[in-house]
A protein has these predicted regions:
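Core dinuclear metal-dependent hydrolase active-site scaffold
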Residues: 13, 43-47, 164-197
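Cap/insert and terminal regions of metallo-dependent hydrolase folds
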Residues: 73-82, 198-281
Length: 281
């Protein structure tokens, strides 16, 4: 971890939406006897004096985003831009966006940040284009993909604001690192490691884990559990989970899981607006 202040960040977990009654089996493979849970949707802000970085962006509830929100049972939503404004961040202030993967709830508002450079794994973007070109009978693969988000990524490429990554990158930005989790949740999912002054390196899991139970096993019994939904293999899912755990020496207080309410027990609540929370890591 760097000791340079420009290479460490203040990190915030920003909740912007919730779905109701999600089957636990869709989060934890094979766990059919635990009923349903409500699910938070979140993204991360990492900032210092030099940079304002988003790790994922959430989605806008209009057009195709509204249709996907209805499809996936999003019962409550507030604009990610409004959530950022609560922390004093304007869209034009965002310098960089690191995308963990291309699902609608993670890159659904990239067009709202006109000055930001975008970073995504090359295989993630290109293989989604391949998947979109398959016959409609393969629609399971693209169920959580918004084609308009892919179009917006290509528009960013036209403006020379898109960087396609090929594998792991240390110091993608000073103090921000990415690790490829290929063929796990998605074709080119990645998790992000952010250096902080207080906690040291912190992992933003993206959807390499849906729940802390993916990391700890049911009731903390210690056996990794693959995700209940993905386009890759269970084996790869477990390998990525293990990488994340080793990254933080099994310290769960240094892993941010974006779809688990349990994280509010690990991080200090900075503010709460109409039930939506922002935590400082």
């Amino acid at each position: 971890m760097s000791t340079d202040p420009s290479a460490t960040y203040d990190v915030y977990v920003i909740e912007y939406a919730r779905s109701r009654n999600q089957p636990v089996a869709s989060l934890l493979l094979g766990v059919y006897d635990r009923g349903t849970v409500d699910l938070p949707f979140s993204f991360v802000l990492a900032r210092n004096a030099e940079r304002t970085v988003l790790i994922d962006t959430g989605f806008m509830r209009d057009g195709s985003g509204a249709a996907l929100a209805e499809k996936f049972g999003i019962a409550a939503w507030v604009s990610p831009l409004e959530r950022l404004a609560a922390l004093g961040v304007r869209p034009e202030d965002v310098t960089d966006i690191v995308l963990t993967h291309a699902h609608y709830d993670h890159m659904g508002s990239i067009d709202r940040f006109p000055n930001a450079r975008l970073f995504i794994q090359k295989r993630e973007l290109l293989q989604w284009i391949e998947a979109m070109a398959l016959p409609a009978r393969f629609g399971f693969l693209t169920a959580a993909l918004d084609a308009e988000d892919v179009h917006e990524a290509l528009r960013a490429a036209e403006e020379h604001r898109l960087t396609l990554l090929e594998g792991d990158r240390r110091d993608l930005l000073p103090g921000i690192h990415v690790v490829l989790g290929a063929d796990s949740h998605t074709f080119g999912s990645q998790y992000v490691v952010v250096d902080t002054a207080v906690r040291g390196p912190v992992v933003v899991a993206g959807d390499c884990a849906y729940s802390y139970a993916n990391l700890t096993g049911l009731d903390g019994q210690g056996t990794y559990i693959p995700l209940g939904f993905g386009v890759g293999s269970h084996y790869q899912s477990l390998m990525v989970i293990d990488k994340m755990m080793r990254e933080v020496d099994d310290d769960l207080s240094r892993i941010i899981v974006l779809h688990d309410f349990e994280r509010w027990e690990r991080f200090a609540i900075e503010r709460e607006d109409d039930g939506f929370r922002i935590a400082r890591v």
